[in-house]
Amino acid sequence: MIVVLVDPRRPALVPVDAVEFLTGDVQYTEEMPVKVPWSLPSARPAYDGEDAPVLLSSDPEHPVVKARLAAGDRLIAAPEPQPGERLVDAVALMDKLRTSGPWESEQTHDSLRRYLLEETYELFDAVRSGNADELREELGDVLLQVLFHARIAEDAPHHPFSIDDVADALVRKLGNRVPAVLAGESISLDEQLAQWEERKAQEKKVKARASSMDDVPTGQPALALAQKVLARVSQAGLPAELIPASLTSVSVSADTDSENELRTAVLEFMDTVREVEAAVAAGRRGEDVPEELDVAPLGVISEDEWRAYWPGAESSASEAEPEE
């Protein structure tokens, strides 16, 4: 006498050890999808007649299942769920909402931006609070945003992608960034960090930026944006004296919109950096090569080049010339 327990999420997937026993007299519990018993030649309901040699079910708490196991029936069960299997359910749920929900079906990447920002802040607060229940809930809310945006992307007329593409990109990135760790090699913290930065730099060479300001997310809070931009221009070799004080000194008062003022200053500074980088590239290119045919990477800009092409440099130089 045998009890076969299948995964309730995939009831049609039968454990391989049970296949040989399903060709004869089989009973099934009522929650099983009708297509499963229909595919078995001699299947009948659990309460129909005497006990069959095999009982097929997806419910370990079903009275008949519990009774037969208590009587000593052999159990053949589906493998235990692997970590991440509930993510499959979450993906399916998001697909149902996107296709059937009046609100979900109308959303776009842009319309969800404020929710993504709000949920990120709430997750930050949950981390700070140390409350495990809040952290679990807020992680779920952020996961919802990831699933939602990925599902919206499936409907895009140009360059669509799915949640599997998102996961694949992450797996590829991590596989490239920390191959030693994933290969099981012994590696120190410093070695791992060095490998991460080295691999990251290699990726950037393949995907060369036209500007040091490329890929800076401007939707982040103004202070975080300013810090990111300052880090970028520092890496790009911009002399410190060219950074305006409006980016490094923030005044906060009740009657000023400090967030908006700082953001405006940072965005204007980013535009200036891009303009100077373009001017440097044009100066190096010369007049004989059209801009659209110039595929050479910008490379390193020296401090002298930054100063020479920075707005106001010519007027400053003329003011500094001694009178004859």
From Swiss-Prot:
Induction: By oxidative stress. GO terms for biological process: dATP catabolic process; dGTP catabolic process; dTTP catabolic process; dUTP catabolic process; TTP catabolic process; UTP catabolic process. It comes from the Bacteria. Disruption phenotype: Cells lacking this gene show are defective in response to oxidative stress. Complementation with mazG restores resistance to oxidative stress. Its cofactor is Mg(2+). The keyword Magnesium applies. One of its GO terms (molecular function) is ATP binding. Homotetramer. Belongs to the nucleoside triphosphate pyrophosphohydrolase family. This is Nucleoside triphosphate pyrophosphohydrolase. The gene is mazG.
